[in-house]
């Protein structure tokens, strides 16, 4: 089916320029790259761009810590990021920075248009100020309890638990991330973008049917709670662009960050000497398609602020947002202590890029679901699918063609009907790639790989090769096998660019989507070389260990209690739920004859008495003051027979030992027998 060539601009969210790329980042860039490569194979004009998000207080402060300028730090980080993405074969047409002339000009242009159109409001606000550091505190440099869902340890601009946005002054019990001080309030004039003016437009955009259902539903919640004016300014000191005609005021990073998509594309057009494409892609009535691949944590900014800014400054809105979930490793959040917080560069020291690209692709869909990188399953799936099914199909047939027929394929297929079954699947597989139902595409491809391998099993070319007068049959069977391999690799080319390049070299033919309608016949292939090696669990073990060592090498020396007594390995919630902690009243406390370490405690659990031996005598040489205190005990610990009697539980205490042991006590109001949760 002939497709009309489309003009498409694709972006990934801009990585922040103060840290390395890790496997969580790579999910998005791989997802977008697979989609882009498929679109290019179908003949569409695709511009794939990204940039580093290079502004904000975190970058300014980190550069100060490193003793370098912010410009030097973001320059070094940009090179590192680009090296990582190139290592994973992310096929960007341009990778730029938000700290650029193009981005400054476009940010000022959009701001000026918004201001001229009446969408920028000025007002004086009370703002949190760090009295120790002498600076206003940006959103991300205040932490406290979310005013909406009451989750602790949340940043000052939005809650990572419930997704709500708010001002830093709304936080409960705020603390400065910079110094730990309790901030004070000071007045400052700020500039606000009038987001509520765009509510009707945004709701119509939401109802257009283009957005993912989960995104549209979340946006509807925000509409129902009411849109608020958005503070787009920050006070000096700040690393970013100064607002025109407003000395000491800077654009908030989230204003100029998405404009970085435009800046990167403008930079690409200028490199090409192209004076028309920028306007063609970004003008109000553009027929080009614009897609943003983003994580679910930044939907608010991309679905509300960004399209409203574009609308208010007379630019086009995105065609769609493609939102994905988070990455977990072995069923849990990535962990530095467990070695599962894995940098992209570390991965490439132990595995090739294709392996991770394949595993992520096999698990992705168009929904906003989290993806678990189970490292054991990863090894099994890569070996089972890529090695045993796809590559094995080529290796089982290539040797006979090379040795017996000088590398020349037969003039006819052994089973044209079977080959048509393969080519007929192109439409459904293509639709799966196009709609980002990547897992579905992989399942269809692997099902056909099974069909191809069954064909080879049934035809048994190794048997035919030993039978006289059957050379033509042997050549036709192996030609059929290699043509099915060619079709499979064509479909997998967007996912496995390195393997696809090796397959093209072997087949002596480019893997083209439309070309599979014509099989390779009477065609000379090159001598077969191993296309892909099996991977092993020992590589995973080395990867995890290397990640742990990297953390040790870069982490600040740990001092205090954690240095002497590190946190234990993570347990599951089910494991924790087995421990029954109860409030207990100490009815009696006395020395244990024959022991200089133990005290015998008689505990009341609110109707049940327990006898507990506890090694706290060194900290409590006079046990009498303990009588009448409340403490916490493990109530379901199996009784333990000791030389002095049976201990029926364990009381909870902290400290390194000796005189520094501190028996835990609940707050006033707790009662014996109550469960500690």
UniProtKB/Swiss-Prot annotation:
- How many and how are cofactors bound here? Binds 1 zinc ion per subunit.
**Record PANTHER family:** METHIONINE--TRNA LIGASE, METHIONINE--TRNA LIGASE, CYTOPLASMIC
Where, in this chain's numbering, is ATP bound?
336
The UniProt record lists the tRNA-binding domain at 575-677
Lineage of source species: Bacteria, Pseudomonadati, Pseudomonadota, Gammaproteobacteria, Enterobacterales
Where is motif 'KMSKS' region found? 333-337
What protein is this chain from?
Methionine--tRNA ligase
Gene giving rise to this polypeptide: metG
User: Could you tell me which species this protein originates from?
Assistant: Klebsiella pneumoniae (strain 342)
The chemistry this enzyme catalyses reads: tRNA(Met) + L-methionine + ATP = L-methionyl-tRNA(Met) + AMP + diphosphate
Give the enzyme's main class according to its UniProt record, as a single word.
ligase
């Amino acid at each position: 089916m002939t497709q009309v060539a489309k003009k498409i601009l694709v972006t990934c969210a801009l990585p922040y320029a103060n840290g390395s790329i890790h496997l969580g980042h790579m999910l998005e860039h791989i997802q977008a790259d697979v989609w882009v490569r498929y679109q290019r194979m179908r003949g569409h004009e695709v511009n794939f761009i990204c940039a580093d998000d290079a502004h904000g207080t975190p970058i300014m402060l980190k550069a100060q810590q490193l003793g370098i300028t912010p410009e030097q730090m973001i320059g070094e980080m940009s090179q590192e990021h680009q090296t990582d993405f190139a290592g994973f074969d992310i096929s960007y047409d341009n990778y730029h920075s938000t700290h650029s002339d193009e981005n400054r000009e476009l940010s000022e242009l959009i701001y000026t248009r918004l201001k001229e159109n009446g969408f920028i409001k000025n007002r004086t606000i009370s703002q949190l100020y760090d009295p120790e550091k002498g600076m206003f505190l940006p959103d991300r440099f205040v932490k406290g309890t979310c005013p909406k869902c009451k989750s602790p340890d949340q940043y000052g601009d939005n809650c990572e638990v419930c997704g709500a946005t708010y001002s830093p002054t709304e936080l409960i019990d705020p603390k400065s991330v910079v110094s730990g001080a309790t901030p004070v309030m000071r007045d400052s004039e700020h500039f606000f973008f009038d987001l509520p003016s765009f509510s009707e437009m945004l709701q119509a955009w939401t109802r257009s049917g283009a957005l993912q259902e989960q995104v549209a539903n979340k946006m509807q919640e925000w509409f129902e709670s009411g849109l608020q004016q958005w503070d787009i300014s920050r006070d000096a000191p700040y690393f970013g662009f100064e607002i025109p005609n407003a000395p000491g005021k800077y654009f908030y990073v989230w204003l100029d960050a998405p404009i970085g998509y435009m800046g990167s594309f403008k930079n690409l057009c200028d490199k090409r000497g192209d004076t028309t494409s920028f306007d063609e892609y970004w003008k109000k009535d553009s027929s080009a398609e614009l897609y943003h691949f983003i994580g679910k944590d930044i939907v608010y900014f991309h679905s509300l602020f960004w399209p409203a800014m574009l609308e208010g400054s007379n630019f086009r809105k995105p065609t769609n947002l493609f939102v994905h979930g988070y990455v977990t490793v072995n069923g849990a959040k990535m962990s530095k202590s467990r070695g599962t917080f894995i940098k992209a560069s570390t991965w490439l020291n132990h595995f090739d890029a294709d392996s991770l690209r394949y595993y992520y692709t096999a698990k992705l869909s168009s929904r906003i679901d989290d993806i678990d990188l189970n490292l054991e399953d990863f090894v099994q799936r890569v070996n089972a699918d890529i090695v045993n099914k796809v590559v094995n199909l080529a290796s089982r047939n290539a040797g006979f063609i090379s040795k017996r027929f000088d590398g020349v394929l037969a003039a006819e297929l052994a089973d044209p009907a079977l080959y048509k079954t393969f080519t007929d699947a192109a439409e459904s597989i293509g639709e799966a790639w196009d709609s980002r139902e990547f897992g579905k595409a992989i399942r269809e491809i692997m099902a056909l790989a099974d069909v191809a391998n069954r064909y080879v099993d049934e035809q048994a070319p190794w048997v035919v090769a030993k039978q006289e007068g059957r050379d033509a049959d042997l050549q036709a069977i192996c030609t059929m096998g290699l043509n099915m391999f060619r079709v499979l690799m064509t479909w997998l080319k967007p996912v496995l660019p390195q393997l696809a390049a090796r397959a093209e070299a072997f087949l002596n033919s480019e893997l083209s989507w439309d070309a599979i309608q014509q099989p390779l016949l009477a065609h000379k292939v090159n001598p077969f070389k191993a296309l892909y090696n099996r991977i092993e669990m020992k590589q995973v073990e080395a990867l995890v260990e290397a990640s742990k060592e990297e953390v040790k090498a870069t982490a600040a020396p740990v001092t205090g209690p954690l240095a002497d007594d590190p946190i234990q390995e993570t347990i599951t919630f089910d494991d924790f739920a087995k421990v029954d902690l109860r409030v207990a009243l100490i009815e009696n406390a006395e020395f244990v004859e024959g022991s200089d370490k133990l005290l015998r405690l008689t505990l009341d659990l609110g109707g049940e008495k327990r006898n507990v031996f506890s090694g706290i005598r060194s900290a409590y040489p006079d046990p009498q003051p303990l009588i009448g205190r409340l403490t916490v005990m493990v109530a379901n610990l199996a009784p333990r027979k000791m030389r002095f009697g049976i201990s029926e539980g364990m009381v909870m205490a902290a400290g390194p030992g000796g005189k520094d042991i501190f028996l835990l006590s609940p707050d006033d109001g707790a009662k014996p027998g109550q469960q500690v949760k």
